[in-house]
């Protein structure tokens, strides 16, 4: 990791500390929802106008003139289809997650935040901190993005922090979240697989792991290197990465439900105390 890449770590840690530092005040003032709305609006607008609109209107923004994605070596038509239909999990969360926050759909927003947090985390710490950077590129890398990876860092950075804010500021988690994460994963991956089938042969990557190409590049490739797996064995990388991802998402769901577990314990103790009191009153009578 280059010295410049430590800036990614520093900014991310600083962002986390800011969220944690303001959480007690925000909860005390009971302005969680308004803060989440502002945060969600910033993420949505940044990603939509900094990235999404470029692929919706490629002729206007000049992306049609580029033959290939210089970073991932993916044909531009494939990249455009993936971006327009949100076939990658992180862009999906960045644009759809804020909508459910505005609609006050706490449970849906919470489930999306679990996936958004995990996806952003593995990209920030599994890929972006290893991206070769020149000093003159750092500002563009942080705020605009390099080549066809428009607002790549900022999208994952803001998604990571918004997800954390949802965990800390929202009260939309319950035990049923364990069921919802499986429903969402099944529904979203089925949607991606359907779109890949509809555009058969036209989409070659950026499909949240549906296509083998996804497992041979980016953060998944770095996972393979870290675990000393065969970097060309897509099936092995898929199996290991899927298992680790599933474990991480379930663990995240457990962690965000800690307040729920605490409340259940308190409720159980209150019920037990009430029964003891009732029994004592009956014996006195």
From Swiss-Prot:
Entry keyword set: Cell membrane, Membrane, Transmembrane, Transmembrane helix
Does this UniProt record's set of keywords contain Transmembrane helix?
yes
Keyword Membrane in record? yes
Q: Which InterPro entries match?
A: DUF5378 (IPR035319)
Cellular component GO terms, alphabetical: plasma membrane
**Membrane topology summary:** Multi-pass membrane protein
Q: Where in the cell is it found?
A: Cell membrane
- Residue ranges of the TM segments: 6-26, 38-58, 84-104, 110-130, 153-173, 176-196, 236-256
Q: Could you tell me which Pfam families the record lists for this protein?
A: DUF5378 (PF17349)
Top-rank lineage group of the source organism: Bacteria
Q: What is this protein called?
A: Uncharacterized protein MG135 homolog
Give the source lineage, highest ranks first: Bacteria, Bacillati, Mycoplasmatota, Mycoplasmoidales, Mycoplasmoidaceae
């Amino acid at each position: 990791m280059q010295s410049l890449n430590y800036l990614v770590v520093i900014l991310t840690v600083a962002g986390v500390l800011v969220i944690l530092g303001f959480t007690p005040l925000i909860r005390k003032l009971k302005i969680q929802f308004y803060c989440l709305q502002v945060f969600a609006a910033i993420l949505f607008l940044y990603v939509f106008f900094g990235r999404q609109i470029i692929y919706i209107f490629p002729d206007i923004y000049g992306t049609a003139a580029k033959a290939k994605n210089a970073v991932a070596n993916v044909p531009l038509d494939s990249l455009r289809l993936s971006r327009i239909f949100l076939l990658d999990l992180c862009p999906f969360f960045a644009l759809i997650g804020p909508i459910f926050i505005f609609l006050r759909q706490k449970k849906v927003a919470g489930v999306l935040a679990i996936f958004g947090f995990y996806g952003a985390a593995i990209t920030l710490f599994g890929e972006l901190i290893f991206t070769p950077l020149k000093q003159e590129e750092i500002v563009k890398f942080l705020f605009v993005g390099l080549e066809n990876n428009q607002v790549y860092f900022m999208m994952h950075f803001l998604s990571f922090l918004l997800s954390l804010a949802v965990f800390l500021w929202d009260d939309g988690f319950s035990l049923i979240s364990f069921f919802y994460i499986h429903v969402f994963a099944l529904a979203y991956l089925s949607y991606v697989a359907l779109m890949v089938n509809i555009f058969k042969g036209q989409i070659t990557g950026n499909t949240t792991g549906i296509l083998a190409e996804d497992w041979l590049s980016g953060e998944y490739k770095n996972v393979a290197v870290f675990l000393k797996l065969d970097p060309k064995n897509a099936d092995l990388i898929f199996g290991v990465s899927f298992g680790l991802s599933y474990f991480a998402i379930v663990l995240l769901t457990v962690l965000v439900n800690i307040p729920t577990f605490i409340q259940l314990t308190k409720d159980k103790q209150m019920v037990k105390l009430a029964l003891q009191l009732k029994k004592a009153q009956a014996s006195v009578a």
